[in-house]
Amino acid sequence: MAVSSALCIFSLLVLAQAQSELQQPKIELRLAGDKRKHYEGRLEVFYNNEWGTVCDDDFSIEAAHVACRQLGFLGAVAWSPSAKFGQGEGRIWLDNVHCTGRENSLAACPSNGFGVSDCRHSEDVGVICNQKRIPGHRFINIMNNNVETLEERVEEIRIRPISSHLKRIPITEGYVEVKERGKWRQICDEEWTPLNSRVACGMYGFPGEKNYNNKVYRSLSMRKKKNYWGFSVNCTGNEAHVSSCRLGKALEPKRNGTCGRGLPVVVSCVPGRAFAPSSSIGFRKAYRPEQPLVRLRGGANVGEGRVEVLKNGVWGTVCDDNWNLKAATVVCRELGFGSAKEALTGAKLGQGMGPVHMNEVECSGFEKSLTDCYFNNDALGCSHEEDAAVRCNVPAMGFQKRIRLSGGRNPFEGRVEVLAEKNGSLVWGTVCSENWGIIEAMVVCRQLGLGFASHAFQETWYWAGDANADNVVMSGVRCSGTEMSLPQCLHHGKHINCPKGGGRFAAGVSCSDTAPDLVLNAQLVEQTTYLEDRPMYALQCALEENCLSSTARKNDHSSYRRLLRFSSQIHNVGQSDFRPKLGYHAWTWHECHRHYHSMEVFTHYDLLSLNGTKVAEGHKASFCLEDTHCDEGISKRYHCANFGEQGITVGCWDTYRHDIDCQWIDVTDVKPGDYIFQVVINPNYDVAESDYTNNVMKCKCRYDGYRIWTYSCHIGGSRSSDMDEYSGMSNQLNHLR
């Protein structure tokens, strides 16, 4: 009886807490004020469509903890009374706030009530938060706008091409129409401006607009009945979408359907270079950024990624303080896309590396480049956990209509089936799986808009695809990884060659919203490199696992091998955990070292001549993938002890110390000279990652026959001079598959 009473009381308490959370007002918080860091400032509350402040009466460190956690930080370091960060304006929303520190929102703490205060703004409270942010916390800027926009009046907006342009891809020109109460209506162009056209083109993925042949549209409008929408549109030109523009004056269309002296609105957009058709080569085979100073990394789809800028020859990231759609749109247009769909914060698309070049970016939306915007050079306090990212509007190319996944358990997996021309008609068929790998699978998932590839399958007998699509219609597929669609990859064309045929051997994929991203700590490699002369009798296990040069097999046990040793620290800065490709059942047992290898080749270690030829090499099998250490606030998930689960958690790193077997390159046979020391992680693409360009690390080194000097170590793609060098490395790795 006592137990049931206790359970009843506990249930009532849980129910009361849930009801309390549902009843508490929804508020948003922000930090404001001058001369402050991004993690500190005057505490402001957004309530009842108005920003206001918090009085310092009875405020405490517990209340500061609640506020900082609500803002996405791990907690508070301190709080400050008496408007230390300047006096705010408007309402003082909260006074006499009493928190225990366990509340999920400042609104859950007892207070005088919203707007009930006897304070002045000279008593505005400020907080100083822990600089570390809660992993995965999404930051949303709340903006107040009392102006009625199109979003409140229309259901949809489109660009409708004239009949002679219907087959053009992409559609760059046509009538701008809005859907209201289920009917499409044209817009009168009397109040239409080039700024409106700029916004309309941007939302459809185009960076600019141009003039069009007015005579053609005037002639067409004279022959067709018009159905005008009853409002004009007023855009400033920096909106990300026409629906964000203000409604202009109401129009009074005449009975004959005209709008005074005007005509239906027409826009003609200029596509970015990657989407512009060419009579000689068709669409560009792969997306390449048009500007050298800004790039996107870590995104699954074309037009999205972490924003990186080039400064003094080194690529770095942008801190997300004040990051918004205007700044994101400048980036998107600069790279040949349209306006921004999203301005992402909190390293939503993975963490970068190297310096943080820009902070507190403020753009008007009309700048030609992000580097033209105002920004703070001082990124003190910013970390890669705050890397800004974008998702851009891109033109509709129709790629998704020509590919599908069939037979999978969910929409993210299945046999790959493509639409191909055969005997003058379009038919669905399969893709030959010979040499099919994760790079090709990445292109498929991108074409379908399903994110990253998690696996590539060369057998799909367990997925019952469309029986009418069993025939192979594409073979010899080899992708570089940057293509927007599978037909843009190299393939055999009409001359199909697939010895195994389709059916059970058709290519398949599984896709995922997220992917890991491994990056080596180049500085640690540079700091820990040294030479060791080690006797052969202590290297028998290493010899068995092919960690020594082939000449070592000719040596007796009393001879020595010269080893270039170093430590490696491999960070997962992606969006999901890095796991071995194979499960327990497929791991390989190595008797000499008495451990399993979850990946036979996890890293390649190479010493190269200055022209790129290998002069010595090594490799490291993943006998143990685990979370050696993690960032603050992240718990270890993978441990090798007792044959535990293997992997590297997001925000953690695995360390291979210099003093363990095979953590070296055998340089016994190397002559004195200048060389390139190279490490490649996941060289065979056994596990999917969001970015492979940063899997390569290179150092310069000089060997005099006795000593070795290692310097200038850096990750692939981290410097402007790496672009050609590392794209070449990517091609070399492709040939290994």
Swiss-Prot record:
Q: According to the record, what happens upon gene knockout?
A: Morpholino knockdown in the embryo prevents the formation of intersegmental blood vessels. Morpholino knockdown of loxl2a and loxl2b in the embryo results in increased expression of Sox2 in the central nervous system, particularly in the eye, hindbrain and spinal cord. It also leads to impaired neural differentiation with morphological defects in the brain where the anterior brain is rounder than normal and the eyes present a flatter curvature. Embryo development is also compromised.
Q: Where are the transmembrane segments?
A: none
InterPro entries linked: LOX-like_protein, Lysyl_oxidase, Lysyl_oxidase_CS, SRCR, SRCR-like_dom_sf
UniProt-annotated stretches for the region Lysyl-oxidase like: 516-718
Q: Which Gene3D superfamilies match?
A: SRCR-like domain
A GO term, aspect molecular function: copper ion binding
Q: Which UniProt keywords apply?
A: Basement membrane, Calcium, Chromatin regulator, Chromosome, Copper, Disulfide bond, Endoplasmic reticulum, Extracellular matrix, Glycoprotein, LTQ, Metal-binding, Nucleus, Oxidoreductase, Repeat, Repressor, Secreted, Signal, TPQ, Transcription, Transcription regulation
Q: Cellular location of this protein?
A: Secreted, Extracellular space, Extracellular matrix, Basement membrane; Nucleus; Chromosome; Endoplasmic reticulum
**Coiled coil segments of this chain:** none
2',4',5'-topaquinone: which positions carry it? 656
Sites binding Cu cation sit at: 593, 595, 597
Cross-link annotation Lysine tyrosylquinone (Lys-Tyr), location = 620-656
Glycan attachment residues as annotated in the record: 256, 423, 611
Q: Which residues form the SRCR domain?
A: 29-130, 159-270, 294-393, 403-512
Kindly provide the PTM information from the record.
Answer: The lysine tyrosylquinone cross-link (LTQ) is generated by condensation of the epsilon-amino group of a lysine with a topaquinone produced by oxidation of tyrosine.
Question: Which residues take part in binding Ca(2+)?
Answer: 517-518, 689, 691, 694-695
Q: What's its EC?
A: 1.4.3.13
How many cofactors are bound and how? Contains 1 lysine tyrosylquinone.
Q: Which domain of life is it from?
A: Eukaryota
Q: Which reactions is this enzyme annotated as catalysing?
A: L-lysyl-[protein] + O2 + H2O = (S)-2-amino-6-oxohexanoyl-[protein] + H2O2 + NH4(+)
Q: Which Gene Ontology terms describe the biological processes this protein takes part in? A: collagen fibril organization; endothelial cell migration; endothelial cell proliferation; epithelial to mesenchymal transition; heterochromatin organization; negative regulation of DNA-templated transcription; negative regulation of stem cell population maintenance; negative regulation of transcription by RNA polymerase II
Cofactors:
Cu cation; lysine tyrosylquinone residue
Q: Which family does it belong to?
A: Belongs to the lysyl oxidase family.
* Record's function text: Mediates the post-translational oxidative deamination of lysine residues on target proteins leading to the formation of deaminated lysine (allysine). Acts as a transcription corepressor and specifically mediates deamination of trimethylated 'Lys-4' of histone H3 (H3K4me3), a specific tag for epigenetic transcriptional activation. Shows no activity against histone H3 when it is trimethylated on 'Lys-9' (H3K9me3) or 'Lys-27' (H3K27me3) or when 'Lys-4' is monomethylated (H3K4me1) or dimethylated (H3K4me2).
Name of the protein this chain belongs to: Lysyl oxidase homolog 2A
Give the species this sequence originates from: Danio rerio
Q: Which gene encodes it?
A: loxl2a
